[in-house]
Amino acid sequence: MSTPTLPNLSQLHGIQNQSLQQQQQQQPQQQQQPQQQQQQQQPQQTMQQPIQNLHQQAPQMQQPQYNLHTTLPPPLMNPNGLGLMGHNMMGGGNNGNNSGNNNGQPQMHGTNLNGLSLAIQNQSSLPQPINNNNNNNNNNSNINNNNNNSNNNNNNNNSNLGINSSPTQSSANSADKRSRGRPRKNPPSEPKDTSGPKRKRGRPPKMDEEGNPQPKPVPQPGSNKKRGRPKKPKDENESDYNNTSFSDSNTDGTPKKRGRPPKAKGDSPSASPTHNTLGNGILNSNNNNNNNNNNSNINNINNNNNNNSNNNNNSSNNNNNNNNSTNNNTNNNNNNTNNNTNNNNNNINNNNNNTNNNNNNANNQNTNNNNMGNNSNNNNNPNNNNHQNNNNNNTSNNSNTTTATTTAPGGNNLTNSLNNAGNLGNLGRVSGLHSSDPNNPNAQKSFPDSTNTMDFQPNFSFFH
């Protein structure tokens, strides 16, 4: 298989800037008249001329027809890693925060989904970005809502201390309520016949030898058993009990102490330590709400019950994406795929990912670790079934796009170099290859650095 020729970096950068400006100018016309725009014949244009329609012009740029199942996507990439690298990912806002156009109309025709394909527009042959944007909004809202539901339910229970717990359903009609206790007997319609012998209750009386009941013995005076406390013997020196006079003073004149002693005069004791008037529940709810806000801004996956730990993990992942991009290729690839799944929502199966992420925090961490291992295996073996399964969980076509193997001129695996370049954030800068590859004549050795760099998170997900 022949390696696709990669255009010059400066030419790609110029073509992109011109094509993007014209796309923004022609966007209202293309939305109003999509059929006429597609039916117009575009003239043959060279590399230096602006491209009017990327769909019709891309095959004319001396590029073979790409089959996403067997080859890599077209190398029409963002040359400097800037520009569209986070703008308008399938109609969303920056970094897929859903702050942009959420009605399914891409602001830039859905271009540059993950820094790889600039020629994906809203066509009937492709999955509609309207549905994807709706899934995007619903999924991001589901992430936050599930987070809010799980955390806020806990917060309500903590803060309100069961006040918001569902009350027992009581009917307005008291007759519908269940009667408690033994039901009352209805009064008899006829009076009872009490002429017969009464029912004998209690212990039967003792019988004598002949079977007659013995009469109860009459207690004799002096023969009763003495009960209670025995009488205190009188003291000879003490007067009669009945004649004793009670006084509030002792014999020495001091008052008798009875009951609780009076409070000590002087400085009053310090008040009890003031408790938190907000209560632990409301404080927890504030913490959780802050964590929810952080999660919504970061748009990370682990928006789960343990928000504090997840925020720390997600912030560390973002630091890995931004700073440690060189040493964390597989880690960044994992984070980028998962984060782009939730942020960009280019994927169809986002609902499953969101439910898994919302319900199983520990499982998400495990799957992230598995994805890290599988992605590292994919760099070694692009035909890894585990990586295909993981990509199928993210998008239905990930396995078709990332399992392509093409040998670069230097003998390097172009898929591995693409993955590594995407993880390094230099996919557009090196035009799909490592800048350190000495065997690649198209690899640029030096690139103009810009102060407006953005976090680049490729996902390698394409629609057929």
Swiss-Prot record:
Q: Where is the composition biased (Low complexity)?
A: 16-65, 78-88, 130-160, 276-428
Q: Membrane-crossing residues?
A: none
- Biased-composition ranges for Polar residues? 1-15, 161-174, 240-253, 433-464
Question: Where does the secretion signal sit in this chain?
Answer: none
The cross-references to SMART domains, in alphabetical order and at most eight, read: AT_hook (SM00384)
* Keywords noted in UniProt: DNA-binding, Repeat
- Please give the GO cellular component terms listed in this UniProt entry: chromatin; nucleus
The record's region (Disordered) falls at 1-112, 125-464
Q: Which residues bind DNA?
A: 177-189, 198-210, 224-236, 255-267
Q: Which GO terms describe its biological process?
A: regulation of DNA-templated transcription
Gene Ontology molecular functions? DNA binding
The lineage's top-level taxon is: Eukaryota
Give any extra note attached to this record.
Several proteins derive from AAC-rich mRNA, which, due to a frameshift also have ACA and CAA codons and thus are Asn-, Thr- or Gln-rich.
What is the name listed in the Swiss-Prot or TrEMBL entry for this protein?
AAC-rich mRNA clone AAC11 protein
Q: Organism, per UniProt? A: Dictyostelium discoideum (Social amoeba)
Tell me what gene encodes this: AAC11
